[in-house]
């Protein structure tokens, strides 16, 4: 098991949720943390809770903009001289039936979730290879098994998994660790910010957030997976059972998933 002390770690989507909790977790373990998000002022306010000033860098970055991703990597190398770990966490969800959906919503989800991961990874890769480091894609159980009313979300998470699984094989002999990290349901703002059929945030969550895994627990699991240089991590018993059922009893899982979503508050099936 490796130590994260003095490792240079970039976290996208670091202004809230799993990204912020992960930045704090890495900082508590002595890492040098680069926080990347669109909410620059918010990151500046949060940075003291992550690490001392000399060990944290905030970079305004919209991962849908290729030049922003390129600048993020350049700023990191200029400040710390290397990159050991890239955590592709920035993401957006949705909740609407495909038949009702404005296609711009799918484009947004693919731009943020998939292309954001691809673009940041592309520019960080030479430094990660040099450091024999790790690249992480924070996906979802929806990246293993379909989730109704989240066509674009599932598609983007499946795409990230396919991209990173392929990248792992391409660099199997180069010392690069590629981790596909699937948290399952985690308490965060992602459901309130989820896009509806016309692209506006739904502003509420259909789940009881207090009953879900906390972002802090999720961040601890991510840290452990990185220190162990894992290639795959699926969190929660429900998450692991869902993935197993998808592989063994796909038709049964389809029916179970339908019933599960139909019971949600404000279910799109109602």
Feature-to-residue mapping (PLM):
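Active-site helix of classical SDR
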Residues: 121, 156
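Substrate-binding pocket helix/loop in short-chain dehydrogenase/reductase
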Residues: 97-98, 102-107
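Conserved glycine-rich cofactor-binding loop
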Residues: 8, 15-16
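SDR active-site lid
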Residues: 173-237
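Conserved glycine-rich Rossmann-like NAD(P)H-binding loop of the short-chain dehydrogenase/reductase
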Residues: 29-46
């Amino acid at each position: 098991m490796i130590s994260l002390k003095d490792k240079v770690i970039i976290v996208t989507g670091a202004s809230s949720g799993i990204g912020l909790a992960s930045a704090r977790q890495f900082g508590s373990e002595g890492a040098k943390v680069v926080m990347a998000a669109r909410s620059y002022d918010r990151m500046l306010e949060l940075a003291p809770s992550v690490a001392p000033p000399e060990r944290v860098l905030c970079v305004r970055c919209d991962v849908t903009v290729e030049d922003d991703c390129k600048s993020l990597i350049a700023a990191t190398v200029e400040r710390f001289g290397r990159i050991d770990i890239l955590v592709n966490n920035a993401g957006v969800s949705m909740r609407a039936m495909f038949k009702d959906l404005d296609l711009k919503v799918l484009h947004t989800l693919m731009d943020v979730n998939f292309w954001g991961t691809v673009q940041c990874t592309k520019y960080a890769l030479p430094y990660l290879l040099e450091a024999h480091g790790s690249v992480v894609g924070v996906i979802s159980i929806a990246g293993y098994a379909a989730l109704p009313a989240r066509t674009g979300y599932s598609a983007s998470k499946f795409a990230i998994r396919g991209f990173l699984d392929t990248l792992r094989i391409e660099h199997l002999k180069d010392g690069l660790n590629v981790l596909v990290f699937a948290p399952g349901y985690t308490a965060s703002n992602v459901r309130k910010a989820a896009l509806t059929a016309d692209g506006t945030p739904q502003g509420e969550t259909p789940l009881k957030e207090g009953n879900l895994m906390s972002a802090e627990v999720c961040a601890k699991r991510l840290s452990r997976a990185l220190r162990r240089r894992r290639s795959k991590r699926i969190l929660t018993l429900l998450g692991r059972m869902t993935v197993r059922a998808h592989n063994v009893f796909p038709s049964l899982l389809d029916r179970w998933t339908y019933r599960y979503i139909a019971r949600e508050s404000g279910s799109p099936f109602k």
